[in-house]
């Protein structure tokens, strides 16, 4: 059996504190403009074709698939800050659409399952969630902090910058992103899985006292204790909605081989699933992002392994259990 194949076991819907029904919207986000490698835009269609909607229906959910949105095409002329960051107008146009779509689906009392695509899309997903749940906390699972500003980013790729917009660190805002705003405070954000940070990201995490658990912490304390500490910090008493943003590169390359910025020494499959199980147990999940699957960065088997991992992440945070 594939390590990610859905087993013939008991399944049940996550008991939600915030949603009236048992409905989810899978929002496909075929976009790779926040980084230089082609392929991430193919992931949503592949994950859907592999059976994600059917997975969630078997769990008991009413599933709506927001078919690939008609994202605005790459502009013929980029914005005035092209020298400061790559594809700023293109990324801005798409993430603004993403914000609106996520907000609309949440307002329909549907859990937003956001399938990317690269992680620059979180500029929009975080704003969309906060527009409906302005006290939501964000659990960011990633090898990277994605907290660079356009000024501090060594690569100038915007998939490494989404949280700088959400936290207000990118101010004064580039003209292309004048629509964004600070929507979360540091006390409502926690990282798990970090192991590759740029110098300015280290400074932000230390100086702003942002809760961040590296792979050293996972090794030292174990994943159960790390998740418990992270949730207690950002969601004391479990009174806040949770937005889980999961970059598959948080996992070890053996677990997630088809992704763009692989870093050795990541989460095991079970550690990744434990995070998702813990989120499901809170009953507080309102949105989940699964980002940076890139089927072109690996052979057929590696692409399938990573696509199946994405399905497992979604199923598990929405309540799949063994018993």
UniProtKB/Swiss-Prot annotation:
Gene Ontology MF terms: arginase activity; manganese ion binding
Residues involved in substrate binding: 144-148, 155-157, 198, 261, 292
CC cofactor: Mn(2+)
UniProt cofactor note: Binds 2 manganese ions per subunit.
Record GO biological process: arginine catabolic process to ornithine; arginine catabolic process to proline via ornithine; urea cycle
Record key words, sorted: Arginine metabolism, Hydrolase, Manganese, Metal-binding, Urea cycle
InterPro entries in UniProt: Arginase, Ureohydrolase, Ureohydrolase_dom_sf, Ureohydrolase_Mn_BS
Binding site for Mn(2+) 2: 142, 144, 247, 249
Biological pathway: Nitrogen metabolism; urea cycle; L-ornithine and urea from L-arginine: step 1/1
Residues noted as binding Mn(2+) 1 in the record, renumbered to the chain: 119, 142, 146, 247
Enzyme nomenclature, EC number: 3.5.3.1
GO cellular component: cytoplasm; cytosol; nucleus
Reactions catalysed according to its record: L-arginine + H2O = urea + L-ornithine
Assembly and interaction partners: Homotrimer.
Family indicated by similarity: Belongs to the arginase family.
Protein name: Arginase
Taxonomic source organism: Schizosaccharomyces pombe (strain 972 / ATCC 24843)
Name of the gene this protein is made from: car1
